[in-house]
From Swiss-Prot:
Protein name: sn-glycerol-3-phosphate-binding periplasmic protein UgpB
Keyword Transport: yes
Main subcellular location: periplasm
Keywords recorded for this protein, A-Z: Periplasm, Signal, Transport
Subunit structure: The complex is composed of two ATP-binding proteins (UgpC), two transmembrane proteins (UgpA and UgpE) and a solute-binding protein (UgpB).
Keyword presence, Kinase: no
Species for this entry: Brucella melitensis biotype 1 (strain ATCC 23456 / CCUG 17765 / NCTC 10094 / 16M)
CDD domains: PBP2_UgpB
Entry's family note: Belongs to the bacterial solute-binding protein 1 family.
Compartment(s) where it occurs, according to its Swiss-Prot or TrEMBL record: Periplasm
NCBIfam families: PRK10974.1
SS bonds (residue pairs): none
């Protein structure tokens, strides 16, 4: 939570501003984002609520495409000296933004410009640490943090003779359930997944406590060598490739496209961000939630944050920075965090909002909704599960996706795909140093 710092001069200025408020034009703050569907509706709702809560600043949300497209649009806008006030950057883009010293103003500094002091002890530690420098300085505001979970179609489970109240816990159990669902005709497809990079490699590493790369996956140093071709990865992706041969596993796309395969009833199981919940609920499907599957003897350890955070560029006016600070403070309020969490499935970033949600019996009334939080906070992180930080993670993800697509298309096996991904990824990381 943020504590307001009030000085005599600030109070005098506030009184003067109130008296002469009509003489000042409203400061508009463009918020570029990559949210669609129910999450886009939430962006618009929160912007409207903030705008109606005061008259000095106006948040103007602008959809700029999917997460990678939004990041690229923001970088291009900064280079042309026309950046938005606020840019939503997905987790993979954090390393890119952190490396752009001089191009961004840390969120903690923005808050200070607005008269607020950031108290990181009031936030979920894993989330704040992910978006902070080693010295603890918060670089971006964690707007929509998420954790990957398993969604499953209860009706399809019942038709296939599976227990609709007992989601599979391990990957072998998921694969067996997928085969039964496909063979029984309960659904045309047993299993799909969004974000093969974030969920099936980065979180796979953390949740199963195996290294993604050297140097603590990049958190202990930028000279990283990928290790995603070790035996457990090969076993996992070969199982997925085998299921893809007859359509038991169906590939939807590189980001969140596969969610449509689940909400349409095409596929009976989906690994997806907890932030995808809004669209799942909106679809009306009879769904259940389970924890992210793991391999016995390896997991479960802890998941790492996904979603996105809000970054602020350098070169804005003092009025803009003050307005952004007010907006960040607004977003940190418990009532706002509770609303965002309950409606969207994203995690409440403050401990106060989490406690308030628990006290309301929300989790008892909505089984599975606490799962993504417990996954992230359940165990102390290891060297393998603190996160992944590469200066060019979006580029490395593209390389992995190309190899996965060739594998799923039957052009190569999992070991070849992962060996190629490591070789190409390491070359790209070295070139970006």
């Amino acid at each position: 939570m943020f504590t307001r710092l009030i000085t005599t001069s600030a109070l005098t200025g506030a009184i003067a501003l109130t008296i002469g408020s009509q003489a000042f034009a409203q400061t508009e703050l463009a918020w570029w984002h990559g949210m669609t569907g129910a999450n886009n509706e939430m962006v618009n709702e929160l912007s409207k609520e903030f705008n109606e809560s005061q008259s000095e600043y106006k948040i103007v949300p602008v959809y700029k495409g999917n997460y990678p497209e939004t990041l690229n649009a923001g970088i291009a806008a900064f280079r042309s000296k026309q950046p938005p006030a606020i840019l939503q950057v997905f987790d993979a883009g954090s390393g890119v933004m952190m490396a752009a010293e001089g191009a961004i103003v840390p969120a903690a500094e923005v808050l200070e410009k607005g008269g607020y002091k950031f108290d990181k002890s009031q936030y979920l530690p894993g989330i704040v640490a992910y978006y902070s420098k080693p010295d603890g300085t918060m670089l971006s505001f964690p707007y929509n943090s998420s954790s990957p979970i398993l969604y499953y179609n209860k009706d399809a489970f019942k038709k296939a003779g599976l227990d609709e109240n007992k989601p599979p816990k391990t990957w072998p159990e998921v694969f067996e359930a997928a085969k039964k669902i496909k063979a029984s005709g309960a659904s045309p497809c047993g299993f799909t997944s969004t974000w093969l990079t974030w969920i099936q490699t980065e979180n796979f590493a953390a949740w199963n406590n195996v290294p993604y790369g050297t140097n603590e996956n990049g958190l202990a140093g930028t000279d990283v060598k990928l290790e995603i071709n070790s035996p457990l990865y090969v076993e996992h992706f070969q199982a997925i490739a085998d299921l893809a041969k007859d359509g038991t596993f169906r590939y939807g796309g590189r980001t969140s496209e596969a969610k449509q395969l689940f909400t349409s009833g095409e596929c009976a199981m989906l690994t997806e961000s907890s932030g995808g919940l809004g669209d799942v609920v909106k679809s009306g499907i009879n769904y259940g939630i389970g924890q992210l599957p793991y391999y016995e003897g390896h997991g479960p350890q802890n998941t790492i944050p996904g979603g996105a955070s809000l970054w602020v560029f350098a070169g804005l006016s003092d009025d803009q920075y003050k307005g952004i600070a007010e907006f960040f403070n607004f977003l940190s309020q418990s009532k706002i965090q509770v609303k965002l969490h309950e409606k969207s499935g994203y995690l409440p970033v403050t401990l106060a909002a989490y406690e308030e949600t628990k006290k309301s019996d929300f989790y008892e009334k909505n089984p599975g909704r606490e799962t993504p939080i417990l996954q992230m906070m359940g165990k102390e992180p290891t060297e393998n599960s603190k996160g992944v930080r590469l200066v060019n993670l979006p580029q490395v993800r593209d390389i992995l996706n190309e190899e996965f697509e060739a594998m799923l298309g039957g052009k190569q096996d999992a070991k070849t795909a992962l060996d190629n991904a490591v070789k190409r990824g390491n070359a790209a990381i070295a070139a970006a140093q």
